[in-house]
């Protein structure tokens, strides 16, 4: 019985912390003069709490595992909702594909450039420089 209560407490604590960060993000987003989704701000809050080790990762792991396990199921209502606009998607298929391709290329270039900027050129141990 104690083990079952402990497991319930771990899941409850994880979901309370996840929702607390979400609602804190929504509250902060409502105060900002620019439009940033509250869920994004909530994820940043959760990231900061975990990165600064204010919040132990083991406290949110049980809830995260449940959400990841059922993530595909959570996307079904969104997919059904998008299909209500099938005629709009069909009419705008070309521009949607072009914008997806261009944005993917831009993301590749930005990640490549930033990775090169952050990591720079590293020398391999035992390798001599270019000599001519």
Curated annotation (Swiss-Prot):
Q: A Pfam family this protein belongs to?
A: LrgA
Q: Where in the cell is it found?
A: Cell inner membrane
Q: Which UniProt keywords apply?
A: Cell inner membrane, Cell membrane, Membrane, Transmembrane, Transmembrane helix
- Entry keyword Cell inner membrane: yes
Q: What broad class describes the main subcellular location of this protein?
A: membrane
Q: Carries keyword Ion transport?
A: no
Instruction: Output the superkingdom of the source species.
Output: Bacteria
Instruction: Provide the membrane topology annotation.
Output: Multi-pass membrane protein
Q: Which GO terms describe its cellular component?
A: plasma membrane
Transmembrane segments in this chain: where? 8-28, 31-51, 63-83, 93-113
Annotated NCBIfam families? PRK01821.1
Q: What protein family does this chain belong to? A: Belongs to the UPF0299 family.
The name of this protein is UPF0299 membrane protein Ent638_2744
Q: Which organism is it from?
A: Enterobacter sp. (strain 638)
């Amino acid at each position: 019985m104690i083990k079952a209560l402990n497991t319930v407490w771990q899941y409850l604590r994880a979901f309370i912390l996840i929702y607390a960060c979400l609602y804190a993000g929504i509250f902060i987003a409502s105060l900002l003069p620019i439009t940033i989704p509250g869920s994004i701000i909530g994820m940043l809050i959760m990231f900061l709490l975990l990165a600064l080790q204010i919040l132990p990762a083991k406290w949110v792991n049980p809830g995260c595992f449940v959400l990841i396990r059922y993530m595909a199921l959570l996307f079904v209502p969104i997919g059904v909702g998008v299909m209500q606009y099938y005629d709009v998607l069909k009419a705008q298929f070309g521009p949607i594909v072009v914008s997806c391709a261009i944005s993917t290329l831009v993301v590749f270039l930005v990640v490549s450039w930033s990775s090169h900027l952050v990591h720079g050129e590293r020398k391999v141990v035992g390798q001599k420089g270019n000599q001519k």
